[in-house]
Amino acid sequence: MVKANENEYRLNFFLSRGYERKICRSCSTPFWTLDKSKENCSDVPCTDYYFFDIKIKSPPLTVRESREKFLRFFEKRGHTIVPPKPVVAKWRDDLYLTIASIVDFQPFVTSGLAKPPANPLVVSQPCIRLEDVDNVGITFGRHLTTFEMAAHHAFNYPDKQIYWKDETVAFAKEFFTEELGIPEDQLNFKESWWEGGGNAGPCFEVTVGGLELATLVFMQYEIRGQDYVPLKLKIVDTGYGVERIAWFTQRTPTAFHAIYGNLVSSFYKKIGVGEVNNELLKAAAIYAGRIDPDIKETITAHREHLAKQLGLDLKYVNEELTRAARVFQVLDHTKTIALMLADGLVPSNSGEGYLGRLLIRRALRVLRLLGSDVKLHELIKDQIDYWKEDFPQMLKNKDYIVDAVINEEEKYNDTISKIPSILSTLSKKSKVDLDELINIYDSNGISPDLILDEARKRNININVEIPHNFYSIVAKKHQNALVRENRKDKIPKEVIDEINNKKIEPTVPLYYKDQYLRTFNAKVLLNYKNFLVLDQTTFYPEGGGQIGDTGIIRSIEGNKQAKVIDTQKYKGVIVHILDKDSPFIQGEQVYGEIDWQRRYRIMKHHTVTHVILSATRRVLGEHAWQAGAEKTEYKGRLDVTHYKLPTEEEIRKIEDFANYIINDRRKVRPLYIERTEAEMKYGVSIYAGGIPEGSEIRLIEIENWDIEGCGGTHLINTGEIGGVKIVNVEKLQDGVIRLEYVAGDMVSNYARQQDEKLNEISKLLNSPVSQINVRLKKHLEEYENLQNLLDKYRKIVLDRIQEIAERISVNGITIYILRDFIDEQLIKEVMRKITSNNQNIVISIRGKDTKNVEIATSKDIKVDKIVDELRKIGGRGGGKGTYGSVSITVEEEKIIDTIRSAITNGV
């Protein structure tokens, strides 16, 4: 929908070259063309695809050739080629995946905070969009989950203009006519409007023969509520479809044939289904623009039209095109999965990992629908081999990609086993709505169509309507990251109000000038109860996983003093939290001293965290990205993304790497560097520990080992750490593992604790520490022998239990009474055996003063009433179905009489 004034689109370029502004007779959208007879905008659905018939001078171009032609064209015209960023948007805290080339420069470059890497520039950025995942294949190439957006960008500042609309449109005309040889009268510039990321502007969609080949956006407004405010920085934001250019020049039956070449036939064979006739596919593709996947009837109409035109049976057409669409989906999804994982995504139940798992499971589901037993990871290997020159990170991370997908395949199979229990729950409901379906998918990873398949097999009726775009709905719901709010809990609102009302200037952080500075003098700027703000300080405020400093602050005269028990920060203002109301007055000079021993230990744990993170990435793979961290006086904690628990050997390697770097006494230094320069020089891995703000960022460099953004305090040499010991590794959540470690003198402290535990075990085993393993092994062997012997005795008792157990009969029901049986396993086995036959109850009574009563009944007897009667005489507990447990302080005979009475009165 065009929102801009017509003058926004009335360019000198069009007027000088004789273009006419026309209105599409189908969609009523204005467009510019040299063809005076043209009546529509040459975009689907206003027309069918007819680009197959347009004569062009360009030879058929592969995806790689299309990309190179575009990049070199703009390089020759003064644009600097910049490398693409990963498809996992690690430099953004509000977005998981790279959905467009402009994302590379948001938010810092587009806001004017940071400089672009070049101006103007050109890039071919791989992108991933999952909001149309259900449409892939159905439209024969119009929808893809992964595509390359070839783009040239120009950033126009008030004092430095690069180029704007006329030049951008001229570049498009020149590229399409001279590089691809498209007749100029076939080009159409369709007026449109773009909005995204809080910005907006007019744009042109460049269409040829029904195919949109490019979009030319002119980002010139900021959206503020209902208003569009002109931006000082005006940005040329273009996007050319590399895959569409390849399809346009190759004129293959579908876009998938142009993108994947011989992989198409290979996938048909490996999946084990017949290849669909190319003539049928080409005919289907020509009319594919008529398909609106959100309207099921358009798919039906498309296939009916095709069957009629080609004189084919409709059932045959449906079967062939459905099979082709599914194979195309597998082709598309496997490439996207390989790209995601190659760029560091770890499949999980949250964040970007959720989107990765969603696509993996959708691919597995499609393979099931195709009746294929091929392994998904085998197909992904083929994608890696096919794209390894275009995306070398795929080959570099091949082992991780394949292993992670195998792991996901195993989890998916485990998930399938949960379907019957979920089906049982849903069958009892009158209707199952979309929210519940999404909740089931989020919680269990089970898609609704799998549930329906199982329901049909079992002849179970479930009242549910599954939207055709279920995966798209779920992906859209999870595509944006949840922006975490900065916690201000430790600074009360009253203090924040005081800071804002008095316009307190940011505190000078002396700890950056000298990280070893212990004492300082400062002036009091603000007092509020036990909260104190100074003009400068060496107290480090909590942030980046490093806890806040403690220490003392006293008056220069020494007659007033308070302990600092914590340090926090609000918008650059450092707040000292005291152990009592501040004794100081505003404007007073004070003396501060941090608890140096505590800070020094924290610095060791912070620096070693950087060492360990880099070691972890070297051992586990580059996908191991920091997901959280904490550095305290006593230990460090690092959470990293990884798909399974590391082996003991991997943990040893990480620890050995870290201690090698410590013993090698590597220099550690802070660097202050312009953000864009840092990204170009070191890559987005500088954001492994978080995304710092500002145009200039602070990096911590460990010589020839690690470099990442960090605002914490560090040692100047790794040798000062002394040593590190990993003390615990555990799975924190799906896709995230936690490492805990101690450094410096905390290593000896940990060793002392371990010695104490060993000595305690030594006493218990009555063995010297050096012989613990031998003695323990012997005890375990004896224990195993005793267990075997006990199992034999249990079997003897179990075989004769109905003969030897005390029992009474009430109303035809036999009650077996087990008094003071201490073997819990035997009790359970007795209960299971006896209650397998109807009209039986087993009661186990244990304990002296307080009796623990367990009741098991056969299926024909409900335990509830028995439990209710025991509650009436003071029992506490509950029961359901055929088992109950009650704690009670009455005599055994009273318990038995109560149960007898309950049965007499009918259970």
Curated annotation (Swiss-Prot):
SMART domains: tRNA_SAD. Catalyzes the attachment of alanine to tRNA(Ala) in a two-step reaction: alanine is first activated by ATP to form Ala-AMP and then transferred to the acceptor end of tRNA(Ala). Also edits incorrectly charged Ser-tRNA(Ala) and Gly-tRNA(Ala) via its editing domain. Consists of three domains; the N-terminal catalytic domain, the editing domain and the C-terminal C-Ala domain. The editing domain removes incorrectly charged amino acids, while the C-Ala domain, along with tRNA(Ala), serves as a bridge to cooperatively bring together the editing and aminoacylation centers thus stimulating deacylation of misacylated tRNAs. It is found in: Cytoplasm. InterPro entries: aa-tRNA-synth_II/BPL/LPL, Ala-tRNA-lgiase_IIc, Ala-tRNA-ligase_IIc_anticod-bd, Ala-tRNA-synth_IIc_core, Ala-tRNA-synth_IIc_N, Ala-tRNA_lgiase_arc, Ala-tRNA_ligase, Thr/Ala-tRNA-synth_IIc_edit. This is Alanine--tRNA ligase. One of its GO terms (molecular function) is zinc ion binding. Keywords: Aminoacyl-tRNA synthetase, ATP-binding, Cytoplasm, Ligase, Metal-binding, Nucleotide-binding, Protein biosynthesis, RNA-binding, tRNA-binding, Zinc. Its cofactor is Zn(2+). GO terms for biological process: alanyl-tRNA aminoacylation.
